[in-house]
From Swiss-Prot:
GO cellular component: cytosol
Name of the encoding gene: leuS
Protein name: Leucine--tRNA ligase
Motif ('HIGH' region): 42-52
Homology family: Belongs to the class-I aminoacyl-tRNA synthetase family.
Organism: Salmonella enteritidis PT4 (strain P125109)
Intervals of motif 'KMSKS' region: 619-623
């Protein structure tokens, strides 16, 4: 064994060994308990960032630990390879998205290997390959036949200059990112999957997810947004149709003083024909983004349509307004307004001088003061005719029943969740497998024509999708009849909604999944990824699992038993102000800093002499230039050091502050372990450990070893507090470094301890542990070694610490045998000099003894 720890030599050698031995390749084995450990697959952007490294290190630690417990562990990896960034990069680099993507995959795969992640590379998937997306296309056609897929018009961002659809990210301050033209909202036909058909089950089954963070479950509950209410129909004078609204507060119905419809509603469109102000308003709304966050804060505007609706219970005529806060995509595109008891309705009514009628009493029974705001709390009705005096629930039921009796209302359960729009007017995605015949009939692509392959050898102009620009690509025949292919592609959330299941059978050619393999491995035991995916990916992931279950492919109801959301990685951020007042962000690597005595940054400059402004720690990002390149750190310290720091610096679900001093500390610790093993093995063969022959000091050290094994096992396995597991190993290492190493049993005990330490560290620092295990004479590869088991007998305490008080004040602590009598404890206390001086020349009047814990001597 060489004296110096040289990670650059060890790591490449161990990685080659894993590759050659195919150490982490697994197959189904009914005789073993399975464990499926999965980290969210990366987008091949070009280089790994520290967020990736943290995510995948957590996954690898869990997988290696479970493997050492003797389980059959699947840990696969792949690439979420379709998406908009590839199109932008292709235009910028004058290439096509496919070669750019495949080059990035090759580069990042090598990066993952240098970090020593124990993946089963035989199961690698790239979602942009026809071998993968063909099954997604086939499944989509089956969902269409089941009635779970439909097409309808929906609003998109449209650039009138480029004549193209823009993604939300391509709209900058309401203008096209390329040509700065004002972006419009345009209705175009798009494909949808009926996720709403599963809304109730998606909501209900959240209760089964005991090992998912409550924050994620709450976000999904709110996103699904189940509500119980009443759907009410209004007659409108001079309009051919009725208006239908939904309300969760029918108790306030007698206070409805106007209706509001979306600018795109047919009623508003009809009214606009003779109303120039309304027509201009509708035009303005067409260019308004409809993101919910913006809807909440934007100014509420409207125009009176001139139509009057009849209140079904009072017979009063109430005005119908077109308003920018009502969306056609939500509900019926019309809402009932009760300004006395809804703040948004109140602000709108106040702005336009509309009637505000209170119908709910304040909590103290008085009429509410509506001079400044609406009363939104529930309460007792007044001003409501026959319903006066009823509280919320009774009023809800009475008014709902009355509306039903008159044939103008029915109770409804509503969901905030909308069907999933899967059409994207982009090129780099899986083609949607639908065709349109010359007579307008829409059909799924026949199975013998699947997959519909996306051409990869294309020229990107940055404006139009190559498959939209090429009329020949769309031409096909179905049953001998000419047809045109759909030129939209799938939302990339489609690919990431089922990849975890395909990992169980990536080479299977008979269908989307091999049910036998899928049901052996699924559900995933632990899924690791960022909380930013809480409502989009993680909801579609659950939805797709239920779709596959109902297609007979899987038997479980949910895709993953446990979800671990890792925290973000933060780093110092610095900038200097340029000549034009702009902020120039400087990498923390290039910042020369001065710190105060507490280690806080007080001054900073860069190599060019710019005085830097320090903004504190923030998420590593390109925009602040504060990302740390993992590759540079691996080359400087080794992968094991980077991994150890990542797991030690913070609990897995909390933010991690990148500090190079902490990385150096992790490196020093590995060197200490290396040094101790080197010194130990240099002394030659070790005798067998004889636990019966150990001295009290040796037994105490062995007790520490086995207590550490028990703690680390619990910290990794049950609590998943990986940082405290590492801290416990570090504490034990400090004791081992100070322990005697000369006697035969000293060395035998150290051998047992070091073999345990190396196995406990193996999930975190697998390269160095692989090497040290061999040096310590461990059997076989450490990758196949069992996890150390704590010896219960060794952990039994034969001594205990007793606190000694004199007149209730702590005067000392003594170590006594666990079975010591009160007399023996008193005698031992009297020998303790810190205690003895308080007993000199006084009489002990009373003794209070709590066995094994406390001795209080009352003196006078």
């Amino acid at each position: 064994m060489q004296e110096q720890y040289r990670p650059e030599e060890i790591e490449s050698k161990v990685q080659l060994h894993w590759d050659e031995k195919r150490t982490f390749e697994v197959t189904e084995d009914e005789s073993k308990e399975k464990y499926y450990c999965l980290s969210m697959l990366p987008y091949p952007s070009g280089r790994l960032h520290m967020g990736h490294v943290r995510n995948y290190t957590i996954g690898d630690v869990v997988a290696r630990y479970q493997r050492m417990l003797g389980k059959n562990v699947l840990q696969p990896i792949g690439w979420d390879a379709f998406g908009l960034p590839a199109e932008g990069a292709a235009v910028k680099n004058n290439t096509a998205p496919a070669p750019w993507t495949y080059d990035n995959i090759a580069y990042m795969k090598n990066q993952l290997k240098t970090l020593g992640f124990g993946y089963d590379w035989s199961r690698e998937i790239a979602t942009c390959t026809p071998e993968y997306y063909r099954w997604e296309q086939k499944f989509f056609t089956e969902l269409y036949k089941k009635g779970l897929v439909y097409k309808k018009t929906s609003a998109v961002n449209w650039c009138p200059n480029d004549q193209t659809v823009l993604a939300n990210e391509q709209v900058i301050d309401g203008c096209c990112w390329r040509c700065d033209t004002k972006v419009e909202r345009k209705e175009i036909p798009q494909w949808f999957i009926k996720i709403t058909a599963y809304a109730d089950e998606l909501l209900r089954d959240l209760d089964k997810l005991d090992h998912w963070p409550d924050t994620v479950k709450t976000m999904q509950r709110n996103w699904i947004g189940r509500s119980e209410g009443v759907e009410i129909t209004f007659d409108v004078k001079g309009y051919d149709n009725t208006l239908t609204v939904y309300t969760t507060r029918p108790d306030t119905f007698m206070g409805a003083t106007y209706l509001a419809v979306a600018a795109g509603h047919p009623l508003a469109q009809k009214a606009a024909a003779n109303n120039a102000e309304l027509a201009a308003f509708i035009d303005e709304c067409r260019n308004t983004k409809v993101a919910e966050a913006e809807m909440a804060t934007m100014e509420k505007k409207g125009v009176d349509t001139g139509f009057k609706a009849t209140h079904p219970l009072t017979g009063e005529e109430i005005p119908v307004w077109a308003a920018n806060f009502v969306l056609m995509e939500y509900g019926t595109g019309a809402v009932m307004a009760v300004p006395g008891h809804d703040q948004r309705d109140y602000e709108f009514a106040s702005k336009y001088g509309l009637t505000i009628k209170p119908v709910i009493l304040a909590a103290d029974g008085s009429e509410p003061d509506l001079s400044e705001q609406a009363l939104t709390e529930k309460g007792v009705l007044f001003n409501s005719g026959e319903f006066d005096g009823l509280a919320f629930e009774a009023a809800f039921n009475a008014i709902a029943d009355k509306l039903a009796e008159k044939g103008v209302g029915e109770r409804k359960v509503n969901y905030r969740l909308r069907d999933w729009g899967v059409s994207r007017q982009r090129y780099w995605g899986a083609p949607i497998p639908m065709v349109t015949l010359e007579d307008g009939t829409v059909l799924p692509t026949p199975e013998d024509q699947l997959p519909v392959i996306l051409p990869e050898d294309v020229v990107m102009d940055g404006i139009t999708s190559p498959i939209k620009a090429d009329p020949e690509w769309a031409k096909t025949t179905v049953n001998g009849m000419p047809a045109l292919r759909e030129t939209d592609t799938f939302d990339t959330f489609m690919e990431s909604s089922w990849y975890y299941a395909r990992y169980t059978c990536p080479q299977y050619q008979e269908g989307m999944l091999d049910s036998k393999a899928a049901n052996y491995w699924l559900p995933v035991d632990i899924y690791i990824g960022g909380i930013e995916h809480a409502i989009m990916h993680l909801l579609y992931f659950r939805f797709f699992h239920k779709l596959m279950r109902d297609a007979g492919m899987v038997t479980s109801d949910e895709p993953a038993k446990q979800l671990l959301c890792q925290g973000m990685v933060l780093a110092d951020a610095f900038y200097y102000v340029g000549e034009n007042g702009e902020r120039n962000w400087v990498s923390p690597v290039d910042a020369i800093v001065e710190r105060d005595e507490k280690g806080r940054i007080v001054k900073a400059k860069d190599a060019a002499g710019h005085e830097l402004v320090y903004t504190g720690m923030s998420k590593m990002s390109k925009s602040k230039n504060n990302g740390i390149d993992p590759q540079v750190m691996v080359e400087r310290y080794g992968a094991d050091t980077v991994r150890l720091f990542m797991m030690f610096a913070s609990p897995a679900d909390m933010t991690l502050e990148w500090q190079e001093s902490g990385v150096e500390g992790a490196n020093r610790f590995i060197k200490r372990v290396w040094k101790l093993v080197y010194e130990h093995t240099a002394k030659g063969p070790v005798a067998a450990l004889n636990v019966d022959a150990l001295s009290e000091d040796q037994k105490a050290l062995r007790r520490d070893v086995h207590k550490t094994i028990a703690k680390v096992t619990d910290d990794i396995g049950r609590r998943q507090t990986f940082n405290t597991a590492i801290a416990a190993i570090m504490e034990l290492m400090n004791k081992l470094a100070k322990a005697p190493q000369e006697g035969e049993q000293d060395r035998a005990l150290l051998q047992e301890a070091l073999q345990a330490v190396v196995r406990m560290l193996n999930p975190f620092t697998p390269h160095v542990c692989f090497t040290l295990w061999q040096e310590l004479g461990g059997e076989g590869d450490i990758d196949n070694a069992p996890w150390p088991v704590a010896d219960e007998q060794a952990m039994v305490e034969n001594t205990t610490l007793v606190v000694v008080q004199v007149n209730g004040k702590v005067r000392g602590k003594i170590t006594v045998a666990v079975d010591a009598t009160e007399e023996q404890v008193r005698e031992r206390a009297g020998q303790e000099h810190l205690v003895a001086k308080y007993l000199d020349g006084v009489t002990v009047r009373k003794v209070i003894y709590v066995p094994g814990k406390l001795l209080n001597l009352v003196v006078g």
